[in-house]
Amino acid sequence: MLLFVGLGNPGAKYSRNRHNIGFMAVDEISRRHRFSPWRRRFQGETSEGTLDSERVILLKPTTYMNESGRAVQEAASFFKLGVGDVTVFQDELELAPGKLRVKVGGGIAGHNGLRSISAHLGNDYRRVRLGIGHPGVKELVHGHVLSDFAKSEMPWVEALCEAVADNAELLTGKRDSTFANKVHLALQAKGFLDKGDAGAA
């Protein structure tokens, strides 16, 4: 069994925020793979299903971003999962819009959701980093992540979430590089990334 966590803030006010792209990604996994309806538990919402014969629990913490670790720890404890069974889908300022990286462990780069999860679980969980781009200067970061994607950005956001969902089965087998390559190739095919953008996980 694996736990896939999408990070974001709860409520309609935040639903299209850049900070909520993790929620958007797991919503699309649930839709594409016909997981169970979302239900409230573990200080969040869960949807359950199977990817490549592996049972997967999707979790969207409703604690707000800064306390995400409480929900993740509660779910992981209930299912007796280790930190290596947890994958977190997060927004990433340091990646260009539409780009993706997969990494196990590492720093939190100022991300409050990751800080909370690391405080509760330790650091050795997998992160699927979904690029939202950087506003250019540090002072604009807070407003950038908590503002909505522009209407003109939604095509690449939707394409990224769809590609993540279409290839999510690869994550159950730890085929992280293949997953990242396939996602980037899907975005290239739709004209959202240049040919040189694929290949790195």
From Swiss-Prot:
The active site is at H19. GO terms for cellular component: cytoplasm. One of its GO terms (biological process) is protein quality control for misfolded or incompletely synthesized proteins. GO terms for molecular function: peptidyl-tRNA hydrolase activity; tRNA binding. It comes from Bradyrhizobium sp. (strain ORS 278). This is Peptidyl-tRNA hydrolase. It is found in: Cytoplasm. CDD domains: PTH. Its EC number is 3.1.1.29. Transmembrane segments: none annotated. Monomer. Hydrolyzes ribosome-free peptidyl-tRNAs (with 1 or more amino acids incorporated), which drop off the ribosome during protein synthesis, or as a result of ribosome stalling. It catalyses: an N-acyl-L-alpha-aminoacyl-tRNA + H2O = an N-acyl-L-amino acid + a tRNA + H(+). The record marks N9 as: Discriminates between blocked and unblocked aminoacyl-tRNA. Belongs to the PTH family.
